[in-house]
């Protein structure tokens, strides 16, 4: 049983928490959570890389780039889910399936390109180089996307209120973002291992 002071504390916290999911603050919440989860996924992936490659240090600029690219995706995702909910009204199974299909066919490749192009250019590559990397890794990325996101989005569109959609995706995406960091930086890590003679 929670004490009276505990209940008062929770009510106070809820008072600060609720505005983050309403009105103009919702887009800020969605934007920052998107960047934060992409950065967290990169931190997890870098921790794995450091454990596998002794002497390797954490690349904070890489994590900062992940945060920036994630924040740039936040507004798109915010308005994308609003559009899906406006165009496919309700959470009947037919509409949910349509939302998932449109999300997979439109948003997934768009956000994949956004991620690879944004990260590539922030890491100092030319647009052409970033575009080539996306082309080289697209099918691996897209097949993995189809394995993860349709089921996650079925839950999202069927059970959750619209204001929590981006936050839910950002929480589920922690594992996905770790994978994206791995996929994006895999070649760099392999080159570093070979140069150090640890491959």
Curated annotation (Swiss-Prot):
Required for the assembly and stability of the mitochondrial ribosome. Is a positive regulator of mitochondrial protein synthesis. Belongs to the peroxisomal membrane protein PXMP2/4 family. It is a multi-pass membrane protein. The chain crosses the membrane at residues 25-45, 64-84, 105-122. Interacts with the large mitochondrial ribosomal subunit. It holds the Pfam family Mpv17_PMP22. Its main location: membrane. One of its GO terms (cellular component) is mitochondrion. GO terms for biological process: mitochondrial ribosome assembly. The keyword Transmembrane applies. It comes from the Eukaryota. It comes from Danio rerio. This is Mpv17-like protein 2.
